[in-house]
C-alpha cells in the first residue's frame, strides 16, 4: 500500500490516492469531421480522490496535497505544469515512464538538506550522502540478485551499452576480436558494434524468427575461439519479445564468452537472476522504472571477474570504471524506484497483464490487423503491444490520435520516417512495418483509459481506411498481390 498519499495532476495526469484509480473518460469524438480530437485533460476531485478527464484545463479545480513528510508544497509547480495545455492519455511507457510520486518525495531531501558530495570523505555532509548512495546501490542490486559492489552508476542505458560493448572487447583485443549480437538490438548497441568494426573487430549479427526470438543453434555456431562478447537484449523495446536469457548465459559460460544483456526494458519487470542466468554485464535505466532521467547502471560481474576499459576516465569513481561525481538526488530516486519495482512487482504484473489482454484483444478485433511479437506468453512482455494496421500508415494514425500519446517504434528513432528495422528483421514488408503502432501499458495506466483507446482506434482506423483506395479494393474482393502495379 502507498505509505505516502500524493495527490497530483498536471504533467503526470494521475491522482494517486490508493492502489486503485477511478477514471472517467470522454467518448472519442466522431471522426467524420476530423480524425483528431481535442486531447482530454485529467483533473481530480479532492474529496473523493477520483480521476476525471475534461477539456479544457481549469486550474482552479486542481487540488494538490504534498506527500506525508514533505516540507515543500508542490501546488505551484503542478499548477504551472497545467498551463502547458491539455494532456493526452499516456501509452508510451517503453519510451519513458512518469516518476512515481514516492520517488519524487525521496529525491526532494537531496535538494534541500542532503546536498553533500558523496565522494567527500572528510566531513559529515559527504558521509551522510555516501550512505544514501550505497543504500540505493543495494536496492538496485537486490532486484537482480547481485552484489551491491557489482553496480556501477552511469548516465543511463545508452552509456552502459557503450561501456560494455566497447570496454570489454578493447580490454581483451590482443587475443579476442569477435563480437556477437542480434539484428533487433537497440540502436545504441548496433551503433557501438559498428564502431568496433571500425576498430578492427568482427561482428556477427544473428537473425531472429518471425516472432523475434533468436535460434540458440545459430548462437552456438557463431561462437568462435576469439569471440569475446555476446550482447543480446532481454526485452525488445519495440515488440516486447523476451529472449531466453538463461539458455544464452549457459552457452556463453560453457564457451568462456562474456554475456551482456541490455535490460533497460526488462529490469524489475521480468524475473532476472544474474547468477542463475550467468549474466556478466547488464544495462539498467532509471527512467524506464518510474525513476528520474539521467541515471542508469551497469552490472559488472566480480567473480569470475569481468575486465573492461573505461569509457570515461578522471577521478576514478565507481571502481575506476566510470569517473565523475555522482548526482545523489538521481541516485536516491533510482534506488527508490528499484525498491518499489521489487515491492510492487506482483501488483504491477497482475495490473499490466489484465490491461494488456484487454487492449490486445480489442485492437485485434479490428479487421486486417496483426500483432507483432511472440504468441507464447512466456516469451512476450505484456506491457508492450505492437500492432500493425494494414492499409494505413502509422504516422497518419498517430496524427489522428492526438489525444493519445503513442509511438510507431523506438523513441530514439521515432523522428525517422524509415520503417522499423526490427519489424523488417521479423520479415515484415515496408507497408506492414510502416503501419505499426506501439502501445505501452504501465503502473499508472487505468482500465478506463484502455477502453477509451480501443474505441478511439476503432473509429479512426475506420475513418482513415475509408480514404484509402487500397482498402476500397480489398473490400471489393480484389487481391492486391495479383495487380501489376508497374502497368498502372
From Swiss-Prot:
Its main location: mitochondrion. [2Fe-2S] cluster binds at residue 412. Catalyzes the removal of elemental sulfur from cysteine to produce alanine. It supplies the inorganic sulfur for iron-sulfur (Fe-S) clusters. Plays a role in both tRNA-processing and mitochondrial metabolism. Involved in the 2-thio-modification of both 5-carboxymethylaminomethyl-2-thiouridine in mitochondrial tRNAs and 5-methoxycarbonylmethyl-2-thiouridine (mcm5s2U) in cytoplasmic tRNAs. PROSITE patterns: AA_TRANSFER_CLASS_5. The gene is NFS1. It is found in: Mitochondrion. Keywords: Iron, Iron-sulfur, Metal-binding, Mitochondrion, Pyridoxal phosphate, Transferase, Transit peptide, tRNA processing. GO terms for biological process: [2Fe-2S] cluster assembly; intracellular iron ion homeostasis; iron-sulfur cluster assembly; mitochondrial tRNA thio-modification; tRNA wobble position uridine thiolation. The modification N6-(pyridoxal phosphate)lysine is found at residue 288. The active site is at residue 412. Its EC number is 2.8.1.7. This is Cysteine desulfurase, mitochondrial.
